Amino acid sequence: MAYADWLRRDHRFSDILVQVSPAPCGHAFPRLKLRYKPSLVQLEGGSCHLPLVESSMRASPLTPSEWREKLEARKRLESEPAGDTSGRNVLLLDVRNGYEWDIGHFEGAKRPNVDCFRSTSFGLSEQEMDSSDPLHGVDKENTDILMYCTGGIRCDVYSTILRKKGFGNLYTLKGGVSNYLTSEGCAEWVGNLFVFDDRLSLPPAKFAEEGEREDAAQEQGGIDTGRSSPSRWLGRCYVCGSEVEELKHRNCASIDCNRLFLCCRWCLEELRGCCCLECRSAPRLRPLLPGHQRYDKWHLYRDATSSTLHISS
C-alpha cells in the first residue's frame, strides 16, 4: 500500500479509488512491473482516436448504492404488466468476456458472446438481424444502458464508442464489480468474480470482508446495512455440461489452444486437462496439474520432456 499512499499525496490523484482484496494463498502480485503500453485496454483499431479524457463522452458513473437502486428499479419494471409502458427501458450490459460471466454476474445480464475484449462489438453491428448483439435494435434515446465490468476501466473506454454511435443514456458502475461487492455485498449478484491473476476467482465474501467490518460498526448503532446472502450459481463443464464443484477456470493443457474453461473432475481426468479430444492429441501438451494451479512457461515443460526422453533412450 506504500505506492498507493505515495500516489495519493499527489493532488492530481488524491481521490483515486484504490481497491484491495485478500490473496488466501500468498501474494497475488509478488512483483511490480512497470511497462509502457500505448493503450490501457486493447481494442480493434486501438483507442488513441477515442475521446477518453472527455467526461461528457464517457458513461455517467453510479456509486454502488445507486447501481443497486437501478437494478432494483429494473426488476420492478420487468414485473409490471406487458402493456404498461410508463417506465423507461433498462438494459443491463456485461462488458466482460463470456468466460467471466460463466462463474458470476449480475442477475438478468446476458452472457456476452465475447472471448477477448479486443473483439467486443456491442452496438456496432450494421446487420438488420444480429441476435448476438445485445444492443441491436435498442431505442438509443429511451433506453438506460447499465454497463459493468470488473474494475470499471473497460466500461469507461467502451462507453465512448457507444456515445459516438448515438447511445445517449449510458451508466457505468464506479469501481466495477469489485467495488460493488465490497460496498453492497451479494445483492443482485450471483456466483463468484473472475480475476486476472493466479487467484482466478474470488467469492463475494472475500471482497466484502472490509465492508462487513464497517457494517459491524454500523449495526452496533442500529443501522440496517441491507446486505444480502450470496445466491448460488452453478457453473457448467465446458466439455459435458454437468455442474462443476468449484467456480474456477483452468487453461487447456494444449499450449496451442490455452483456452480458459470450466471442467468437471471426470472430464478433467479423461482429457488430461484438455478442453476437447482434438487438443488431447495435440503435439505440444503440458501435464495435468493438481487443483487449479497455473501453468508456467512452455519451455519448462518442453525441456523436462526432452530430458525424460533422453534418459529413457
Where in the sequence are the language-model features?
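Rhodanese-like catalytic fold shared by cysteine-dependent sulfurtransferases
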Residues: M1-S60, S65-S79, R88-V90, N97-L146, ...
